[in-house]
From Swiss-Prot:
Protein name from the UniProt record: Small ribosomal subunit protein eS12
Pfam families registered for this protein in UniProt: Ribosomal_L7Ae (PF01248)
Gene Ontology terms: cellular component: cytosolic small ribosomal subunit
Phylogenetic lineage: Eukaryota, Sar, Alveolata, Apicomplexa, Aconoidasida
Alphabetical GO biological process terms: maintenance of translational fidelity; ribosomal small subunit biogenesis; translation
Keywords: Cytoplasm, Ribonucleoprotein, Ribosomal protein
SUPFAM superfamilies for the chain: L30e-like
MF GO annotations: structural constituent of ribosome
Amino acid sequence: MSDVESADNNVVVEEKAVFDNVTAIQKVIKNAHVHDGLKIGIREVIKSIESQEAKVCFLSDVCSEPAYKKLITTLCAEKNIPLFMVQNDSKDLGHWAGLFKLDNEGNARKIIGASSVAVVDFGEDSAEKDFLLSQNQTVTA
């Protein structure tokens, strides 16, 4: 044995900066889902907006009912809650919110679409959350 101690090689992993809205939205929704901070579906989202419990809302641009879009947009503007329009399919929003079953290989199947999702608890702070909140009130992703 030698008298010289070997220095620990601490590897610091740097996080990539978030530059697109879709990735940031995915990370924020998944983080909120892990910390049980999501409201999914039109009824829960409207309740959380009216009680001003929602911190941010996501609305699928491909929503089948135009009245839903108008209602959520108006309520978010009235209560000053940031609203992000997600141009992806509502099944993508549902997948990000955890509305699916896993098959034997661990792949998502039976994905249920979600027209709207509200975040009431972000969980832990992240660069993605800061990036989204620094954007305008109504952003198209």
